Amino acid sequence: MSLWIFLRHGESEANRSRVFSGHQDVALTALGEEQARAAGQQIADMPPLQHVLSSDLQRARCTAELALQASGCTLRIQTTSALRERNLGEWQGQSIDRLKAEGARAVLHSWSGHAPGGESLAMLADRAVAYLAAQPDHGTTLLAGHGGLIRVLLGLIDGTPWDEIGRVNIPNAIPMTRTVGPETWTDILRSLHPQSAN
């Protein structure tokens, strides 16, 4: 069993402006950079990292870089598009408050619902878990990512009913830990597609 530390990026320009970013590559704010460094100080008090994974989007990657610097860790960051935020299609760059007032909340919370041209939580889960299941067990791992991504991964680890996962709040730049076994991601991937596992 290995300790995994899940870290949502610090405040981004899109967070501050209250717009959906999804796959858009937006930067951290000055506050977001401070949050990332503070997270690194917390991570310094945890077991030493042996592996670091990150979304390739700059808000997650920069959060990982700043957190590692603050923690004194010099590991290389393995970045991948497989750990990106949920693609929100036509909603990317649009006002969160306006879209939620127009009924987007139910779609966002649904396991299978998606924005026009975007991904559902189920599609995000398929993409991310397939990638993680293909990785060797490196021991204590930091995963720097996004609210939607981490919401899905923690929900699946914890056994949260799929249609409740979308309601889980993931704060910016607060390290969240779970114990992950060598078969955890493979078992979760099978659970997402029980018919193909037979």
Predicted regions: what they are:
Residues 7-71, 102, 119:
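Active-site-proximal alpha-helix that buttresses catalytic centers in soluble enzyme cores
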Residues 4, 139-148:
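Generic beta-sheet signal
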Residues 69-127, 167, 188:
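Phosphate-handling substructures
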Residues 59, 149-150:
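Alpha-helix capping/helix-boundary segments
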Residues 1-3, 39, 69, 73, ...:
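Acidic, low-complexity terminal tails and accessory targeting/binding regions
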Residues 56, 111, 147:
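Short secondary-structure boundary segments
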Residues 37-44, 125, 129-137:
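Generic structural signal for well-ordered alpha-helical scaffold segments
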Residues 49-56, 78, 140-144:
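Short glycine-rich phosphate-binding loop at a beta-alpha junction
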